[in-house]
């Protein structure tokens, strides 16, 4: 499977960036893995072959296999469609936090979606969702709650454990949801700003998507997290950012 690139955007008006006379292109994000799996018919094929579970991981982290047996056991016993490995996370750490998002029947889901574009558009039925919330959105979201922000609990860590993109999927459920949705994960834009007013980009940005947003494709299935330790190594980060681990 090979991921295609998408046109880059040069400004807040979403004008296409051009470089050396050609449209500048950038990766669309690892959320494309779901659409690619579906386009190649792999989850449906695996389900027919009797395969039950799929692990997705990122090769910058060499340690997830330490947790695989435990994660599979939890996934089976809890009947999860997707299970995320979570690790202890410091408040404000540049790692997404896994949360349970919920709101009651008196909340307009369209307003929630517009305010936090990472979140799912759901029926106003009081349903909830266990999903990653990116660190740059987590603290602003929590500031509007009694917690007052992304702060430590008695353990010294954030109550919202870190997402490390070690994801276990039930193959049958995944195949069914991909057949319905095409594996198209909702997109977002995360530009790097050149000014305090947030009117100019430092460099062209692009639409992107994330593989950990799969729960947004299966709102009726059970998705959860399993809190682990010593399953994460920041091989992609500079040593000065990783040494404390």
Predicted regions and their residues:
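Catalytic core of tubulin tyrosine ligase-like
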Residues: 46-58, 63-67, 72-245
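Conserved N-terminal catalytic core of the sugar/cofactor nucleotidyltransferase
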Residues: 1-51
